[in-house]
Amino acid sequence: MDVIIRQARKEEASQIAELFMLAWPVDDILESNGLTYEQLHESITLIAANEETIYSYENTIVAEIDGKVAGAMCAYDGADYQRLKQPIVDVLGPDCGFAKMKETEAGEFYLDSVGVLPEYRGRGIASRIIEAQCERAATLGHKVAGL
């Protein structure tokens, strides 16, 4: 099994959304927003395809196995958190959990949602993606990365 760790692509937004949703309390999000799983997935896909969001493909590194996106993780400069989370609040509403969270701040490169498809878990894929995001943080000049 060859695992390729690389930058995500815009056309992979749907797969990225699916993987991020594996890391979230989806049932709570659906209940609090009155959405179906499909509606949430569609909304997160649009967000992942956008450049100016937390969950953007530009902030995401993926693990590819046999041409399939098997894992993903987004990470970003904490100084941009408030601005980058606004598109999510716009989609899910001001009462969503995302609106109330303050996960990071300036001075930290924040390692956010990581998801791996169930059939690929237990193979060190998440660890490799996290390592790649930490390397990305260093390349971008960050001295602190947090999860």
Predicted features by range, described:
Residues M1-E11, L22, E31:
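Conserved N-terminal entry element of GNAT/NAT acetyltransferase domains
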Residues Y120, G124-A132:
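Conserved acetyl-CoA pyrophosphate-binding loop and the N-cap/start of the following alpha-helix
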Residues C74-S113:
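Conserved acyl-donor/pantetheine-binding loop and adjacent beta-alpha core of acyl/acetyltransferases
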Residues G107-F109, I130, A137-L147:
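Conserved GNAT acetyl-CoA-binding A-motif
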Residues K68-G71:
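Glycine-rich acetyl-CoA-binding "A-motif" of GNAT/NAT acetyltransferases
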Residues A49-V62, A79-R83, Y110:
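A short helix-loop-beta-strand connector motif used in the catalytic cores of GNAT acetyltransferases and
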Residues P25-A48, E58-N59, R83-K85, G93-P94:
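Conserved GNAT-fold acetyl-CoA-binding loop/helix
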Residues A8, V114-V116:
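Hydrophobic adenine-recognition pocket in adenosine-nucleotide-binding enzymes
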